[in-house]
């Protein structure tokens, strides 16, 4: 039996173990998935002991999707372009980083039959998840993508020069957007009573997507629904990216990869 898992901070709420372990059992894959709640100063030891602990692959979530880059020997497109990794394959002599969130997000839009071509899009946040969503929307030919951040100066260092980045306090004309995506943990399990932004006026058929999936309806999604939006939480994205990660780990070889 080989170990896989999720590294992050304050992530006991994650549904990933259930998704992965059910899939492993159903498909007779000799993997077990567990949570690794790590502080920043524990990551070094985690990486050093991967082979000792028989870990063949792991996912990465908040706040380490960018931190993990320094430990990788190879980063596969589009993760290299995004600058954030959420899936790592452990081979005998190297660590390979991928971004299956990218695939999961695109597949979730396909699942809900949402075509974002020519959409005006607003991304809330500027971390690893936001960068992933930006490049996915760009790939899908969204017409216009704007990013709002609590720290726009810092955010500008992470994105292409042409990207429009505003202070989250200054963007109040939300009725211009066809799609709004929350890429922050605000509204998620550790911040349930908060909203990342006020949805005062939005298009009636606007799609509001919260990458958080616990609770099923965040305060943001509840408000969006009340204002006539089509709402999506991050559950389908989580499932699709999980299946993609499993495929990569199996592709790399159950017996250590070649």
Swiss-Prot record:
Which residues participate in NADP(+) binding?
125-129, 211, 234
Any one of the GO CC terms: cytosol
The reaction(s) annotated as catalysed by this protein in its Swiss-Prot or TrEMBL entry are: shikimate + NADP(+) = 3-dehydroshikimate + NADPH + H(+)
Q: Does the keyword NADP apply?
A: yes
Enzyme Commission number, as recorded = 1.1.1.25
- The SS bond pairs are none
Q: Where are the transmembrane segments?
A: none
The keyword Amino-acid biosynthesis is assigned to this record: yes
Q: In which pathway does it act?
A: Metabolic intermediate biosynthesis; chorismate biosynthesis; chorismate from D-erythrose 4-phosphate and phosphoenolpyruvate: step 4/7
| InterPro entries, per the entry | Aminoacid_DH-like_N_sf, NAD(P)-bd_dom_sf, Shikimate_DH, Shikimate_DH-bd_N, Shikimate_DH_fam, Shikm_DH/Glu-tRNA_Rdtase
- Catalytic residues (positions): 65 (proton acceptor)
**An individual GO BP term:** amino acid biosynthetic process
Q: Which residues bind shikimate?
A: 14-16, 61, 86, 101, 213
Q: Which domain of life is it from?
A: Bacteria
Keywords in alphabetical order: Amino-acid biosynthesis, Aromatic amino acid biosynthesis, NADP, Oxidoreductase
Gene Ontology molecular function terms on file: NADP binding; shikimate 3-dehydrogenase (NADP+) activity
Q: Subunit composition?
A: Homodimer.
Its annotated function is as follows: Involved in the biosynthesis of the chorismate, which leads to the biosynthesis of aromatic amino acids. Catalyzes the reversible NADPH linked reduction of 3-dehydroshikimate (DHSA) to yield shikimate (SA).
Q: Which family does it belong to?
A: Belongs to the shikimate dehydrogenase family.
Q: What is this protein called?
A: Shikimate dehydrogenase (NADP(+))
- Organism encoding this protein: Clostridium botulinum (strain Langeland / NCTC 10281 / Type F)
Organism placement in taxonomy: Bacteria, Bacillati, Bacillota, Clostridia, Eubacteriales
């Amino acid at each position: 039996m080989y170990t896989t898992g999720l590294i992050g901070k304050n992530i006991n709420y994650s549904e990933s173990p259930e998704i992965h372990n059910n899939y492993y059992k159903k498909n007779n894959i000799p993997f077990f998935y567990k949570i690794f709640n790590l502080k920043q100063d524990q990551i070094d030891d985690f990486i050093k002991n991967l082979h000792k602990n028989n870990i063949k692959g792991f996912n990465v979530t908040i706040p380490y999707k960018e931190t993990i880059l320094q430990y990788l020997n190879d980063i596969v497109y589009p993760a290299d372009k995004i600058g954030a990794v959420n899936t790592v394959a452990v081979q005998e002599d190297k660590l390979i980083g991928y971004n299956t969130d990218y695939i999961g997000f695109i597949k979730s839009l396909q699942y809900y039959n949402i075509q974002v071509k020519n959409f005006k899009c607003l991304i809330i946040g500027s971390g690893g998840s936001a960068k992933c969503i930006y490049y996915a929307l760009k790939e899908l030919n969204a017409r216009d993508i704007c990013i709002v951040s609590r720290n726009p100066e810092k955010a500008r260092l992470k994105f292409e020069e042409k990207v429009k980045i505003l202070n989250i306090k200054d963007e109040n004309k939300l009725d211009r957007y066809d799609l709004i995506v929350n890429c922050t943990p605000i509204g998620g399990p550790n911040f349930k009573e908060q909203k990342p932004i006020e949805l005062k006026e939005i298009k009636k058929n606007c799609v509001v997507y919260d990458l958080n999936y616990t609770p099923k309806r965040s305060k943001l999604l509840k408000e969006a629904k009340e204002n006539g939006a089509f709402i999506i939480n991050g559950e389908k994205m989580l499932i699709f990216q999980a299946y993609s990660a499993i495929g990569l780990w199996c592709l790399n070889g159950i017996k250590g990869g070649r």
